[in-house]
Design a protein with these regions (language model features):
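Active-site/catalytic core of tyrosine-dependent DNA strand-transfer enzymes
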Residues: 139-181
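Conserved tyrosine-mediated DNA breakage-rejoining catalytic core shared by Y-recombinases
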Residues: 57, 63-66, 72, 99, ...
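N-terminal core-binding DNA-recognition domain of tyrosine site-specific recombinases/integrases
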Residues: 1-40, 45, 84-85, 162-165, ...
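Short alpha-helical segment immediately N-terminal to, or the first helix within
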Residues: 17, 95-96, 196-197
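Active-site-proximal segment of tyrosine recombinases
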Residues: 105-108, 183-185, 194
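Short functional hotspots where side chains directly engage DNA or cofactors
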Residues: 120-126, 158, 185, 196-197
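Basic, Lys/Arg- and aromatic-enriched nucleic-acid-binding interface segment
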Residues: 23-33, 44-103, 152
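Short, leucine-enriched amphipathic alpha-helices that occur as contiguous helical runs
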Residues: 7, 31, 73, 88-90, ...
């Protein structure tokens, strides 16, 4: 019963998750926070006299998100892929690295969003998620990538046929083929932007 939940039991539960179940710290934290929510509600409703989680603390120990260094990005940019799909995914990833755009913002990017201001090309649009306006100056590399896919543009879409789930697995293959051992997701491209900016 809930009355048997003590601070010692909770500590033993965390040890059990680690040793017997082989869970990492983040997963242990998730399981403990779920149990803590149930226990706190029971305590709040008067079902148990005290909160056994009051003195218990575990950190999620969340790692910093990985990103490609400038050298790794150069390796990716210059690698010759036999598979044209990997080349396309690489170009989208590199584009995101230089513009800090999210996948969905790149997917929704149209030729109308690219404008010339004082002789320079800019992306002027709104973030899909927040609807907040933004502007990004297009440097040489993103401009070259846009130009490369101009022949394939349909319905003003700058990068046609983009689907997030269809690039996840090939992205990992692409990174591995370049000899990069980091666990890289598409979102990591935006974190790399800070090192390039």
């Amino acid at each position: 019963s809930m009355l048997e939940l003590t601070p010692d039991f909770i500590k033993e539960f965390a040890v059990f998750l680690s040793t017997d179940r082989g869970l990492q710290n983040g997963s242990i934290w998730t399981n403990c926070m779920w149990l803590k929510g149930v226990v706190m509600r029971a305590h709040f409703n008067g079902l148990i006299p005290r909160n056994p989680f009051a003195q218990f603390h575990i950190s999620p120990n969340i790692k910093e998100r990985e990103y490609l260094t400038e050298d790794e990005l150069k390796t990716l940019m210059t690698h010759e892929f036999a598979d044209s799909k990997l080349s396309y995914i690489r170009d989208i990833f590199v584009f995101a690295s230089f513009t800090a755009l999210s996948f969905v913002d790149i997917k929704e990017l149209t030729t109308d969003d690219i404008v010339e201001v004082n002789g320079e090309k800019w992306i002027i649009s709104k973030r899909h998620k927040t609807k907040i306006p933004f502007q990004v100056k297009l440097l040489d590399i993103p401009l070259q990538i846009i130009k490369r896919y101009e022949p394939y543009q349909t319905d003003k879409s700058v990068f046609p046929n983009l689907n997030y789930w269809s690039i996840c697995k090939p992205l990992k293959k692409m990174i591995k083929e370049c000899g990069i051992t980091k666990a890289i997701s598409f979102h990591c491209s935006r974190h790399g932007f800070a090192t390039l900016a």
